[in-house]
């Protein structure tokens, strides 16, 4: 995408706060996404910071000052304002103050997606770092699907996204900022979507915008004709600045970040107990609340008590502009807490923390990670073996596996019973066949029938009935039963048509076979 196709976003940045928020609201509601943010580029610090935003996601607890019913749009707009107010309250360490309004939000009132939106305020991105910084530097939109599945190197807010289930994030560059939209749905990259989002800001651009600064900026700007000229501002940091002296005049942005990195790393070593609050995929809101609220007094008191030595971790800035200087106001306590929140929480997930551990502890951590990886692989294998899985979490996989194993056990028991029954029938049939003996002799009109088979009730009567049907009249019968074996000797006379020996045997066998089938 060439630079000529990029919307002149400095017009948007120069619009009033409400108008900018209205544009963000229109853009995010038109696509039904969760939130929208405008990252404003600060030329003095060379960094993208929070400019404005609009939250369009789920709400856990609603608090409003309106006595009557409000529309959904009004409620969402008020929610975005309340989230920003809560962030400022937490930043100032006044979350427990009795002076707060009854309608003000508390950390426990927020959903995970609201926490994601709230914590975005604390982030900043020097181009080309982070998604917004990359989009701004490349002058091309950046689309990320599966933001909750990547690591922190790919997406710096990946831990937040995983907790809030933010799956898709897109950053669209403007000349003085970046528009970011996010959703809990997984959406494929769509160029028409990007063009549609740009159109909302393009259609509302003003031709003569007023100069504006982002909400993060604290510069006092003199309204002079020199404001329209482009001035290259060089800022350097002395060694005293890195030690915390507030008297330096020239500050380097790069060395400032290095200082914050060193100090936040040192602070981590003195607060190692807070690392346990932040496990992969854990509840991020609890961590941030603990960071800002669990020791607010000590944090602020430490900052104030050391003011004689270090007034603020963000030292006084003096920007050279010709012969004049514009001095920046500082807020030692608020900026100190903000710095702790910005730099301390990401380092809780930084892999470099393992380098500070003893060798034995490091080996234990590596072994534990490998054990978890193997356990996850086993769960994946187990999931592939179970034909039906209700959900993809470990508890559901185990539950479905147990149910499937019980089903297999029941099926095996049924098959074993069926096999035993069939085997018993085969054995019984073979026994009957081997024990069946029928001998028939017919001499003139005298008939002698000798037979042996398995006994059953009514067997003798059935045999006599068959002989009668063949025209053979029984004259004498001798029978015996021994261990379910039936033996009989029948003498008879042929009356009428003489039946053959084969016909008599066949008839007797039919009677016995009929008994076997029963």
Curated annotation (Swiss-Prot):
Subunit structure, as described in the record: Homodimer. Interacts with MYB4, MYB5, MYB6, MYB82, MYB113, MYB114, MYB75/PAP1, MYB90/PAP2, and TT2.
Subcellular location: Nucleus
Miscellaneous remark of the record: TT8 might interact with TT2 and TTG1 to modulate the late genes of the flavonoid pathway.
GO molecular function terms noted in the UniProt entry: DNA-binding transcription factor activity; protein dimerization activity; transcription cis-regulatory region binding
GO biological process: flavonoid biosynthetic process; jasmonic acid mediated signaling pathway; positive regulation of anthocyanin biosynthetic process; regulation of flavonoid biosynthetic process; regulation of proanthocyanidin biosynthetic process; seed coat development; seed development; trichome differentiation
Organism for this UniProt entry: Arabidopsis thaliana
Record's function text: Transcription activator, when associated with MYB75/PAP1 or MYB90/PAP2. Involved in the control of flavonoid pigmentation. Plays a key role in regulating leucoanthocyanidin reductase (BANYULS) and dihydroflavonol-4-reductase (DFR). Not required for leucoanthocyanidin dioxygenase (LDOX) expression.
Protein name as catalogued: Transcription factor TT8
Boundaries of every bHLH domain copy: 359-408
Gene3D superfamilies: Helix-loop-helix DNA-binding domain (4.10.280.10)
InterPro entries: bHLH-TF_ACT-like_plant (IPR054502), bHLH_dom (IPR011598), HLH_DNA-bd_sf (IPR036638), MYC/MYB_N (IPR025610)
Family: Belongs to the bHLH protein family.
Sorted UniProt keywords: Activator, Coiled coil, DNA-binding, Flavonoid biosynthesis, Nucleus, Transcription, Transcription regulation
Classification via Pfam families: bHLH-MYC_N, bHLH-TF_ACT-like_plant, HLH
SUPFAM superfamilies: HLH, helix-loop-helix DNA-binding domain
Coiled-coil features, chain-numbered ranges: 220-240, 405-428
GO cellular component, one term: nucleus
Tissue expression remark: Buds, flowers and developing siliques, but not in leaves, stems and roots.
Gene name linked to the record: TT8
